[in-house]
Amino acid sequence: DLRERGLSKERVCRDISEIIAGNTILIAYNAHFDLSFLYYFLLRSGDPDILRGKDKLDLLTVYRDRRPYPHRLLNAIEAYGLGGKVRNSHRALDDVYATLAVMEAMDAEKQDLVQYVDLFGYIPKFGCPGKPIGSVTYRPQTGGRPLYEEGEIAHV
């Protein structure tokens, strides 16, 4: 039974490779964390090069530009009035549905998501989170105007 035995790491890596093959954008809420986790999983059990050349969109960066603290996914769900539509149970599938709903609400609010592709923000007092992703530009997020309009690029 799948629930008892699960899937092999190799099988999961193959499935991930098939899902993100081709011209795919990788979207997440707190994408740096998720992509780092995925990279190291693929490094041990698959091929991390499948992530190379993929566009990346971090909805946490977008949310920080649009709303005051706090910035958890739950806060975004509440801010966009999605509580009756999605759950923030911190379960993988629920998080996927919640992230998709938040992205749709963000796009309906302001159609500038393309400006955030491969642009991740970070809180200056904490610095860049972990090892930088090579294809991503990191900028300190201080508020006031959209991050994509900021001129300062972080040196990481």
Task: Describe the role of every protein-language-model region.
Residues 92-102:
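Alpha-helical transmembrane segments that form the membrane-embedded catalytic/substrate-binding core
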Residues 42-46, 63, 67, 80-84, ...:
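Short, well-ordered alpha-helical segments in soluble proteins
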Residues 55-71:
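Short alpha-helix plus adjacent loop in nuclease-associated cores
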Residues 100-156:
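Acidic two-metal-ion nuclease catalytic site recognized across multiple nuclease folds
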Residues 1-45, 50-51, 74-90:
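Conserved non-catalytic scaffold segment of RNase H-like nuclease domains
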